[in-house]
Amino acid sequence: MGFGATVAIGLTVFVVFIATIIVCFTCSCCCLYKMCCRPRPVVSNTTTTTVVHTAYPQPQPVAPSYPGPTYQGYHPMPPQPGMPAAPYPTQYPPPYLAQSTGPPAYHETLAGASQPPYNPAYMDPPKAVP
């Protein structure tokens, strides 16, 4: 037997041995699995916190008084002593003017003058090839 055959046989035996060990450690019926993977007692390192919800004191419901308070409008406050007055008058802005009516966005007369409408009835018939 030559050197190459000896190396091939040795390598094959090594691969088979490693495969057997892997299969034996993963199979539950193997003696190596039973010896190395004994069931261990489960130890809990977690703590349990119990939260107790107590009733939050609710305020006594107040019966609504009808009619409710009415809105009295805006009353500007007088400026405080030593503070400058507001640089703008305290009044409402003028109402917006209505938009002026401008020309429509599409004019048929201008659009018709630039290009005639397409009508397939006016197309030239196909020309015969001589």
UniProtKB/Swiss-Prot annotation:
<keyword id="KW-0539">Nucleus</keyword>
<dbReference type="InterPro" id="IPR026910">
    <property type="entry name" value="Shisa"/>
</dbReference>
<dbReference type="GO" id="GO:0042771">
    <property type="term" value="P:intrinsic apoptotic signaling pathway in response to DNA damage by p53 class mediator"/>
</dbReference>
<keyword id="KW-0053">Apoptosis</keyword>
<comment type="similarity">
    <text>Belongs to the shisa family.</text>
</comment>
<dbReference type="GO" id="GO:0005783">
    <property type="term" value="C:endoplasmic reticulum"/>
</dbReference>
<feature type="region of interest" description="Disordered">
    <location>
        <begin position="76"/>
        <end position="130"/>
    </location>
</feature>
<feature type="transmembrane region" description="Helical">
    <location>
        <begin position="3"/>
        <end position="23"/>
    </location>
</feature>
<keyword id="KW-0812">Transmembrane</keyword>
<dbReference type="GO" id="GO:0031965">
    <property type="term" value="C:nuclear membrane"/>
</dbReference>
<dbReference type="GO" id="GO:0072332">
    <property type="term" value="P:intrinsic apoptotic signaling pathway by p53 class mediator"/>
</dbReference>
<dbReference type="GO" id="GO:0005635">
    <property type="term" value="C:nuclear envelope"/>
</dbReference>
<keyword id="KW-0472">Membrane</keyword>
<keyword id="KW-1133">Transmembrane helix</keyword>
<dbReference type="GO" id="GO:0005789">
    <property type="term" value="C:endoplasmic reticulum membrane"/>
</dbReference>
<comment type="function">
    <text>Can induce apoptosis in a caspase-dependent manner and plays a role in p53/TP53-dependent apoptosis.</text>
</comment>
<protein>
    <recommendedName>
        <fullName>Protein shisa-5</fullName>
    </recommendedName>
</protein>
<keyword id="KW-0256">Endoplasmic reticulum</keyword>
<feature type="compositionally biased region" description="Pro residues">
    <location>
        <begin position="76"/>
        <end position="96"/>
    </location>
</feature>
